[in-house]
Amino acid sequence: MPFRDHFEGDDLDGSVWIPHYLPQWSSRVESAATYEVADSELRLSIPAEQGLWCAETHEQPLRVSGIQSGVFSGEAGSTVGQQPFRDGLVVREAQATQWGWTPHFGFLEVRARMELSPRSMASVWLAGIEDEPQRSGEICVFEVFGAAIDAVGAGIHRFRDPSLREDFAAPRLPIEVSEFHVYAVDWRPGRVDFLVDGKQVRTLEQAPDYPMQMMIGVFDFPAKAGAAEHAGHVPQLLLDYVRER
């Protein structure tokens, strides 16, 4: 049965979603998302009081509210974990394996809108589950920076997958990202199509060939040039649904 989550009820489905961003490199406490599920919407936000993520190990100050549909890591002190952001990174807090939703090919879409400032960004992407190190490619469904609000990033990041090549672009689209739009990928063997509101915006003749988990997040960069001018702004990413068909 195709996966669908319309965020009904008053909380996330804990069998599917982990309301933390890469907790193995931080901790469950320090990686916890600020979120609300209400009126059939998921609302991720970064309020002023939210602290930094991986303050001691991430090169640039970063705040994030994110959820993910799977998690996996080795023991504390090991280097086994999903999406390491630098060489030699070690697991700070071991995570119990959870595969909530890990599709392998399909037409996947989200209906989303975002409220960003020039110091923030929002993204939805699929990440290889990394049960084997090379199964680490990413399919970026969308990535939008507040400093370039009409540029909608989409593509593939290879990371440690030797079968993929890096191919990412951010075409400027005539849309208002503060309004709801449907962002989708048609992921098939050897090909990924990227769509916005049903219109194809990119096609790549390559594709990861393994299970992937969905990552949904809003990010704030406090050290970005001019960031102080927007310190009072609360970045938000709102989702109406996530589904496959």
Predicted regions and their residues:
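GH16 jelly-roll
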Residues: M1-R245
